[in-house]
Amino acid sequence: MTTAGFVVSHARDADFERGLRSFFEYRDLGIKDATGGKVVAHVIRAAAGKEFSGQPHLHRTIFQLVYVLKGWIEFEYEGQGTVRLEAGSCVHQPPGIRHREVGHSEDLEMLEVVLPGDFATEEVASVDG
């Protein structure tokens, strides 16, 4: 039986890097390595001076949770319309739900937890399929 590794990630030691979206920066929390790739968790923040694309897409996941730590973000979701998430808001994005970003604040920070740790993202023509 494989045991997950113990990991602690402190903000004071944090490095943010470019990732999936060019208009965001990502801080890896070490969960992917600790779980052998089963889960990824990162803090995402708005990248200064970058414009968001608003490109409709979906993720091939088992589970995806977003919790807003600071600021706000708006998404348009398939079958749900536009949803604004503010500090303290949490959303579970079902596997394969089509969505796109509508906008976000300059001070946006959010926690994202996704299973599996490596997942595919596919661009789609529209949110409504």
Give residue spans per PLM region.
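A short glycine-rich, His/Asp/Glu-containing loop-to-beta-strand
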Residues: 15-57, 62
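Short acidic-glycine-tyrosine-enriched beta hairpin
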Residues: 79-96
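Hydrophobic/aromatic beta-strand elements that line small-molecule binding cavities or substrate pockets
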Residues: 43-45, 89, 99
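Short beta-strand segments in beta-sandwich/barrel cores
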Residues: 52, 71-76, 90
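Double-stranded beta-helix
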Residues: 2-11, 17, 100-129
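Conserved catalytic-core motifs of eukaryotic protein kinase domains, centered on the activation segment
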Residues: 78-80, 103-104
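Short, conserved beta-strand element in jelly-roll/cupin
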Residues: 43-46, 58-75, 113-116
